A protein has these predicted regions:
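Phosphate/nucleotide-binding beta-alpha loop and adjacent structural elements of enzyme active sites
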Residues: 1-257
């Protein structure tokens, strides 16, 4: 019953947010054979998303644009600096670029196909405050293996081994700050299929001193011990934290100071 109410809530929100809201249920329930659709946000961008096998774009769109999972706990200024790790096709980066239009968004996505659509979405909407990078983020500045999930283009991972893999350039969070001369990050968003642990646990305190808010998905953590280690480290670095379960399969950690 709760799942039905959740879907009805998303449909109602799609009517509020989308000019072509009628496309949302068609894609959500996989009733179209078109490989792509464009969602036209009211007073906002057009967003290209995939609809076929292997695409969870519609669910990512619902989480980010309709349910506002990454920004719901925070108030940020218009000139905020955002780092988006695991930017997929750019849905959060574009939302952040519009809400904080005097700021800057550093967007990192390792998969070439996802990155192409991210770039299309940026160029089509003539957005100039997103800096996209076709990089993975990990504890390495070298090439690493990205394991591909043929059933979900949003679930490629450097940890969950599959038969299909590609070599991708990686960068550490520390080097993101140094290479881009970032002196302050108002929000660090992470959705990188389990790489959150090695990214955060290998980032020095001097970098955390420049970060003021963090939001990350927690559903990838089958080992609760690792998530607790992250939380304890954030507490050591003067962050307050809260875990929230948004739905049965959507959990998030919010941190701020």
């Amino acid at each position: 019953m709760a799942n039905i109410f959740f879907k009805l809530k998303l449909l109602c929100k799609s009517i509020i947010f989308l000019k072509n809201w009628y496309v949302f249920p068609i894609v959500y329930f996989r009733l179209t054979k078109k490989p792509f659709v464009h969602f036209r946000i009211k007073s906002g961008p057009n967003l290209k998303i995939r609809t076929g096998k292997g695409s969870s774009d519609i669910h990512v769109f619902a989480e980010i644009w309709l349910d506002n999972v990454y920004l719901r706990e925070f108030n940020l200024k218009k000139n905020s600096t955002i780092i988006d790790i695991g930017s997929h096709i750019g849905l959060f980066s574009i939302l952040a670029s519009r809400k904080f239009d005097n700021g800057k968004v550093y967007s990192f996505e390792p998969d070439k196909y996802n990155f192409e659509i991210l770039s299309d979405n940026i160029q089509f909407n003539k957005i100039n405050n997103i800096l996209p990078f076709n990089f993975a983020v990990s504890n390495s500045n070298n090439f690493i293996k990205l394991y591909c999930d043929e059933n979900d283009f949003a679930a490629h991972s450097i940890h969950k081994k599959t038969l299909d893999s590609i070599d991708v350039q990686s960068i550490t969070l520390k080097n993101i700050f140094y290479n881009n001369n970032i002196v302050r990050c108002d929000l660090l968003k992470l959705d990188c299929e389990g790489a959150e642990y090695e990214i955060l646990m290998n980032t020095p305190k001097e970098i955390f001193q420049k970060i003021y808010k963090i939001c990350m998905e927690t559903d990838h953590f089958t080992d609760e011990k690792k998530l607790n280690e992250i939380i304890n480290q954030l507490h050591d670095f003067n962050f307050k934290t809260i875990k929230k379960q948004i739905s049965n399969n959507m959990g998030y950690l919010y941190a701020w100071k």
